UniProtKB/Swiss-Prot annotation:
EC code(s) of this entry: 3.6.1.-
Reaction catalysed by this enzyme: 4-amino-2-methyl-5-(diphosphooxymethyl)pyrimidine + H2O = 4-amino-2-methyl-5-(phosphooxymethyl)pyrimidine + phosphate + H(+)
Cofactor(s) needed by this chain: Mg(2+); Mn(2+); Co(2+); Zn(2+)
Disulphide bond pairs: none
Residue numbers annotated as active site: D8 (nucleophile)
InterPro entries the record matches: Cof, HAD-like_sf, HAD-SF_hydro_IIB, HAD_sf, HMP-PP_phosphatase
Top-rank taxon: Bacteria
Protein's recorded name: HMP-PP phosphatase
Similarity comment: Belongs to the HAD-like hydrolase superfamily. Cof family.
Function: Catalyzes the hydrolysis of 4-amino-2-methyl-5-hydroxymethylpyrimidine pyrophosphate (HMP-PP) to 4-amino-2-methyl-5-hydroxymethylpyrimidine phosphate (HMP-P). Can also hydrolyze other substrates such as MeO-HMP-PP and 4-amino-2-trifluoromethyl 5-hydroxymethylpyrimidine pyrophosphate (CF3-HMP-PP) to give MeO-HMP-P and 4-amino-2-trifluoromethyl-5-hydroxymethylpyrimidine phosphate. This hydrolysis generates resistance to the antibiotics (bacimethrin, CF3-HMP) by reducing the formation of their toxic forms, 2'-methoxythiamin pyrophosphate (MeO-TPP) and CF3-HMP-PP.
pH influence on activity: Optimum pH is between 6 and 7.5.
Organism: Escherichia coli (strain K12)
Cofactor note: Magnesium. Can also use other divalent metal cations as manganese, cobalt or zinc.
Length: 272
């Protein structure tokens, strides 16, 4: 029996309308009744996730910013990882050949250079939103991550530019087909989950995890039981062909799987 369950949010636990379904909330409550530790592992900001947990009265550990921060049940900071100032400066000041919008994150929030109302649709559940700033005046010493949002083909070309400029000084990953992230070296959800399990006195073999994008890859391969969403990025499924694929987030597939796991642990599972 797993002792910890780690969940990506967008494309995994959240439905396409960016809400948590009632079946999902009920299943999370059942896991807690079984003394299974809940962990939300997401690219979203800690401030937003703490608000969501409070609104839902959920007790869960948080891995946020794709592993840049880990918080306890009480909100205590257990781990932090920031971009080096010179890396943040290069990414912010360089003229990149891209149409993608740039977004900067630190402990105070989410910052960008212009209004992009369409991006806020993903945050209707929490009301979290960006702050408009002159990105060239952003303090460089506390940037957790920088991400670019836009067309996937454009982001793929940008990824090549970033690799050429940064080399091994940053970790690049797609958290969605339309979002490319620049993270500290060695920073990912899997590394953050390792920190958390050590804090809790658990083994990664004691954990299960669910995800749908390339920023979930390290987490999914490190745990005892990793599960890929039916709506996952094709790249993730191609890289991890040995992991089981469950249903679509629109059908609350994580809840569907876990209900079977809780009620019929010895029977084979079908996502249908």
């Amino acid at each position: 029996m797993a002792r910890l369950a780690a969940f990506d949010m967008d494309g995994t636990l959240l439905m396409p309308d960016h809400h948590l379904g009632e079946k999902t909330l009920s299943t999370l409550a059942r896991l807690r009744e079984r003394d299974i530790t809940l962990t939300f592992a997401t690219g979203r900001h800690a401030l937003e996730m703490q608000h969501i947990l409070g609104a839902l009265s959920l007790d869960a550990y948080l891995i946020t910013g794709n592993g840049t921060r880990v918080h306890s049940l009480e909100g205590e900071l257990l781990h932090r990882d920031d971009l080096p100032a010179d890396v943040a400066e290069l990414v912010l000041y360089q003229q990149w050949d891209t149409r993608a919008s740039m977004h900067i994150f630190n402990d105070d929030g989410w910052f960008t250079g212009k209004e992009i109302p369409a991006l806020l649709q993903a945050f209707v559940y929490s009301g979290f939103r960006y702050q408009i700033i002159d990105v060239k005046k952003m303090p460089l010493g506390s940037v957790t991550k920088i991400c670019f949002c836009g067309d996937h083909d454009d982001l793929t070309r940008l990824q090549i530019q970033l690799y050429e400029a940064l080399g091994e000084r940053a970790h690049l990953c797609f958290s969605a087909t339309d979002c490319l992230e620049v993270l500290p070296v060695g920073c990912n959800k899997g590394a953050a989950l390792t920190v958390l399990t050590q804090h809790l006195g658990l083994s990664l073999r004691d954990c299960m995890a669910f995800g749908d994008a390339m920023n979930d890859r390290e987490m999914l391969v490190s745990v005892g039981s990793g599960f890929i969403m039916g709506n996952a990025m094709p790249q993730l499924r191609a890289e991890l062909p040995h992991l089981p694929v469950i249903g679509h987030c629109r059908n609350q597939a994580v809840s569907h799987y876990l209900t079977h796991w809780l009620d019929y642990p010895h029977l084979p599972y079908s996502p249908e």
